[in-house]
C-alpha cells in the first residue's frame, strides 16, 4: 500500500488473502490501522473520470437510476474484475466489484463466486424430500389441532364469556402497553366483571410452551377481548365471533417506518391478498394524523383506528414517577451522576429477528470518548432487542460508555437523557415529550428509504439534525447544532393528548365506563 496525503493506492492478491486461500464471497471494507482505524473512502475523481468515459446510451441508462448510490455503483461496475475458469467458463466465475454498499453507505469490494451446482445422489435427494414432507405434515397437524381447539371453544362460548386475554409472540411478560392497560383495568375495577388471562412468548422464533399450545387456541376462542401489541401470526389463521374484540395496541408510538400492508411489494411485506392484521376490530394510536397510516398498515377501516393516546406514554407525564426513576437510574448507573447523558439508541439493520445486527464500525469510539472527556459526558448504548452482535466496550472506554441494552424499559432511561442519538427508531416520539435535542445518524438513509421507507419524507419529518457521516455527527455535537426548534411542533402534531391519561381513555372507550 502507498499513502500520499489523503489518497492511497492498494494492491493485493485475492488468491491468498484468507490464510493462503482465496477471499470468500462477501463484502469487504478497506480499513487502515495506524493506532486508530481509518475506513477507506472512494476518491470522487474516480467517479468523475468514469462518468466522462460514458457514451450516450450509457449516460441515458445512468440518468434513469433514481438513487445516488445506484448511479455511483453503475460507474464502478465498469471496474469489476471477472476471473473465469479457463478464461471462458460460465459456471465457475470469481468476480470482484467495487461498490458503495447501500446498507452501510461505505466503499467496499463485493466478491461473488459462481460454482457448478453439485448433483445430489438419489439417496440424498430422497432424504431431503422425506424431511421436507415430514416438516410439512408436522406443520399441518399442528395447524389442524390449533384450529380444532379454537373452533370447538368458539362454539361453546357463543355468549360472552367475561374473559380478557393479553397475548404476544414477541414479549415474555406483561409489559409495555399491556402493563398500563392491565393496571387501568384494575383501577377501573373491570376485573370485578372479567377474568384476565395472559399467554406470552419471548420472540416469534421461540417454541411455545407445551401447555400454551393448548391454552392459546382455547383462550382465543373463548375471550371477549383480545389484546395484541405486535405481529401475531396465529390469530390471522382463524375466524373470530362477530362479538369478539381484537384490539391492537401497537408497541411503537406514531407512524414512522412503514409496516404491514404499507410495505406491500417490498421485501418482507405482505401481498394484497394476505390475511395478516385484518382481524383487528380496534387499533389505538396517539393522534389523528396516525389514523390513515395505521388503517392502511393493518388493512382495516379508518373508523376502527382510535386516537386515545398510547398507554405506555402515560408515565412520561408523571412528575412523581420522574423524580423517583431519576434517583433509581442514578443508583443503578452511578456513571451518569453529574454528567451530560447521551443515549445512543438506533434501530437494527437486517430483514428481521434472524438477521438483525448493527454495524458498530460506523462509530469512531476513540473520537467519541475524547468528546466525552472534554464535555464531561457519558454515552449509554441501547441497542434494539433483535441485534445479535453485542457491543464490545474496551477497558479504557468504560468510564465514558456503558451498554444498557439489557434494560427492558427504555422509557426509564429517557428520564435521565440529555441528548438522543438515533436514526429510524420510533423512540423519537417518546423522547419528544421531554422537549430535548435529538440527532439522527442516518448513514444509510438512501438504502433505508428504498427497502423500508417512511410514511412521511424523513428529511422534513424528524425533529432534529440529520447527519449521514460520523464526521458530521461529531461536528453537530461539538457545535451543539441540534435543530431543537423542531421538537415542540413535532410533539404537538403527534400527541393529541399530553396529560398521561391515555390508558384511562382506552379502557373507557372499550368498556363504555
From Swiss-Prot:
* Xref: InterPro entries: Glycerophosphate_synth, TagF_C, TagF_N, Teichoic_Acid_Biosynth
What does this chain do? Can catalyze the polymerization of the main chain of the major teichoic acid by sequential transfer of ribitol phosphate units from CDP-ribitol to the second glycerol phosphate attached to the disaccharide linkage unit.
- One GO MF term, please? CDP-ribitol ribitolphosphotransferase activity
Record EC number: 2.7.8.14
Q: Which UniProt keywords apply?
A: Cell membrane, Cell wall biogenesis/degradation, Membrane, Teichoic acid biosynthesis, Transferase
Q: Give the pathway annotation.
A: Cell wall biogenesis; poly(ribitol phosphate) teichoic acid biosynthesis
Protein's membrane topology: Peripheral membrane protein
What lineage, starting at the top, does this entry show? Bacteria, Bacillati, Bacillota, Bacilli, Bacillales
Highest rank taxon of the organism = Bacteria
Family according to the record? Belongs to the CDP-glycerol glycerophosphotransferase family.
Query: What name is this protein filed under?
Result: Teichoic acid ribitol-phosphate polymerase TarK
Where is this gene product found? Cell membrane
> Biological process GO terms, please?
cell wall organization; teichoic acid biosynthetic process
One Gene Ontology cellular component annotation?
A: plasma membrane
Q: Which reaction does it catalyse?
A: 4-O-[di(2R)-glycerylphospho]-N-acetyl-beta-D-mannosaminyl-(1->4)-N-acetyl-alpha-D-glucosaminyl di-trans,octa-cis-undecaprenyl diphosphate + n CDP-L-ribitol = 4-O-[(D-ribitylphospho)(n)-di{(2R)-glycerylphospho}]-N-acetyl-beta-D-mannosaminyl-(1->4)-N-acetyl-alpha-D-glucosaminyl di-trans,octa-cis-undecaprenyl diphosphate + n CMP + n H(+)
Q: What class of enzyme is it?
A: transferase
